[in-house]
């Protein structure tokens, strides 16, 4: 399986991880054979385990975060982000002209904003949703991205910042 360290651990953007059940297959896939790349066989050389020769040190940032937070800290971070996402979606979902398209399963949910002028014209709701997202982002209070779900424009609520707190959620 694979996961993204950027989202949950707030490490550099290109820190993804793949957990492989068969080390020999993993090694064979990524091994770089060249005459000038010598191995003494005494220690694992990371260039044989990553897609690019230039990424050997990428794991240090992840190691530092895991060492600092520990398993309990990581668990608390993930649970807090999930709780904040749910609170934002549930709170916003109670506002007039707001429709919850997807409640968070983990840390992401989807909201749609219906044009208060009425009507069932989807394009008007799409436009209004885009306007609401632009206004929120322009305020600087929060940042959301637009998305499309089942042909409806919506606002993607995604919480993964370790500094996000209850006051941020309340203001949002």
Model-identified regions with their sequence ranges:
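Generic non-transmembrane alpha-helical segments
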Residues: 87, 91-95, 131-142
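Short, hydrophobic beta-strand segments
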Residues: 64-65, 110-115, 155-160
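PLP-dependent enzyme catalytic core of the Aspartate aminotransferase-like
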Residues: 149-172
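Conserved PLP cofactor-binding pocket of PLP-dependent enzymes
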Residues: 103, 108, 138-156
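Conserved PLP-binding catalytic core of the aspartate aminotransferase-like
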Residues: 99-136
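Active-site C-terminal subdomain of aminotransferase-like
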Residues: 2-95
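A generic structural motif
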Residues: 7, 68-71, 115-117, 161-165
């Amino acid at each position: 399986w694979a996961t993204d360290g950027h989202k949950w651990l707030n490490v550099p953007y290109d820190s993804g991880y793949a957990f492989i059940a068969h080390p020999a297959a993993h090694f064979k896939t990524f091994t770089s054979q060249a005459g000038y790349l010598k191995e003494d066989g005494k220690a694992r050389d990371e260039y044989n385990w990553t897609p690019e020769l230039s990424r050997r040190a990428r794991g240090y940032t992840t190691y530092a975060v895991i060492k600092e937070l520990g398993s309990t800290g990581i668990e608390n971070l993930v649970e807090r982000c999930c709780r904040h996402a749910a609170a934002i979606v549930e709170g916003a979902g109670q506002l007039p002209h707001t429709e919850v398209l997807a409640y968070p399963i983990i840390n992401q949910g989807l909201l749609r904003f219906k044009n208060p002028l009425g009507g069932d014209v989807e394009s008007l709701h799409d436009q209004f949703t885009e306007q609401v997202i632009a206004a929120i982002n322009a305020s600087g209070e929060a940042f959301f991205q637009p998305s499309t779900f089942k042909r409806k424009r919506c606002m993607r609520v995604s919480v993964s910042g370790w500094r996000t707190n209850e006051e941020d959620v309340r203001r949002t």
